[in-house]
């Protein structure tokens, strides 16, 4: 019924992502920044980007329920990046995934170090199959991302492939932001809500 401000002790202008370790609720991660925008091509000018929101300083972690915070993924504001989504592997808490403006990052050691495992820009959402955590879906789009679409890995991030086929054949295309949701009872059912310049689209 009531909310309390939680200071982090860091220069945080915005938080777009948070995840709490289901196996240890005192451990949590927040993704800073919430940069998003659009890109339009104008004749004789070229692409013009219109950013919105704020830039971040990476990912912060707390192991004492939010009383204190340390940097996990260390960025600076002048790098102009943000973290859009964080997902902790429900079966292996040391495996953490992050969708960022710089691509997809993964930590395999509980946030001590991070690797960019999928460098397509503007990752906007990420979901992990709770029954098979090697299967992960990532959405990319917006800000002129050169690889907008929904991607899937079935080998824990070793390889990614586009999963943009409509039932009956043919790809669906979009350039706006996409968010994903997975059925808790049937993880093979995934929903995608996609923003386009001509209105939002929803797919299953």
What residues fall within each predicted segment?
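Extracellular glycan-interacting surfaces
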Residues: 1-204
């Amino acid at each position: 019924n009531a909310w309390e401000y939680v200071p982090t002790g860091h220069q945080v202008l915005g938080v777009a992502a948070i995840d709490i370790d289901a196996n240890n609720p005192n451990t949590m991660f927040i993704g800073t920044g919430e940069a998003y925008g659009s890109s339009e091509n104008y004749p004789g000018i070229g692409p013009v980007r219109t950013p919105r929101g704020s830039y971040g300083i990476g990912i912060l972690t707390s192991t004492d329920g939010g009383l204190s915070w340390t940097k996990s993924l260390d960025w600076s504001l002048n790098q102009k990046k943000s973290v859009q989504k964080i997902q902790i592997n429900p079966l292996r808490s040391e495996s953490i995934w992050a969708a960022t403006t710089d691509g997809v990052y993964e930590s395999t050691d509980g946030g001590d170090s991070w690797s960019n495992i999928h460098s397509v820009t503007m990752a906007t959402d990420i979901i992990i199959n709770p029954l098979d955590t090697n299967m992960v879906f990532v959405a990319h789009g917006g800000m002129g991302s050169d690889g907008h679409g929904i991607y899937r890995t079935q080998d824990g991030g070793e390889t990614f492939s586009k999963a943009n086929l409509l039932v009956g054949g043919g790809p669906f295309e979009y350039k706006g932001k996409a968010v994903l949701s997975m059925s808790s009872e049937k993880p093979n059912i995934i929903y995608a809500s996609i923003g386009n310049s001509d209105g939002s689209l929803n797919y299953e």
